[in-house]
Amino acid sequence: QVGVADAAPMLAADADLSRCRLYAVPSNDIWARDHGPITVHRDGQPVLLDFRFNGWGEKYAFELDDRITARLHESGAFGPTPREPVDLILEGGSIETDGRGTLLTTAECLLNPNRNGLDRAGLERRLGETLGFTRFLWLRQGHLAGDDTDSHIDTLARFCDSRTITCEPKRRSATPVSGKRCTISSVISLGYSTTSKILAI
């Protein structure tokens, strides 16, 4: 647990820290979105799924980041919520869900040999077992030049609700896409219901 001095910026902003706890753990990078736990509910109780993290396909050092969730749990940061290690590499930014069993993701990331080495059927089975997905929407477009994540879905398309997907139909020149785009038609081609909405932003 970190001392009050480490919370100086929040104190200066007059934030109420009465219910805040700060923990210091060694890390390689800042992307808690990708290496942090994913929470699921079982029998009405939360469970922290601690997937493996390998620095986006071993592009960067990752050993410390891969241990952060376990170290925080050992420090009591999550209270009584149980932690369950999952022997599968998965980043938080690589998956998008409507909360009703549908997964939206990219083949370029999740099926990349530098992650798990599983084929589509094998990965769908594992994700169904661990996260409860029953419907899988795979985008094959969307590679961004200079993107170290191998096309995380959270930069391409997001669920607004269970009937609405938001995506950018054409990327600006400042963020070039190497010959491929996440277009409205590519989302529709996944078989997403024609009664649903595809919003272009």
Spans of features found by a protein language model:
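The feature marks the mature, well-folded catalytic cores of soluble enzymes
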Residues: 1-201
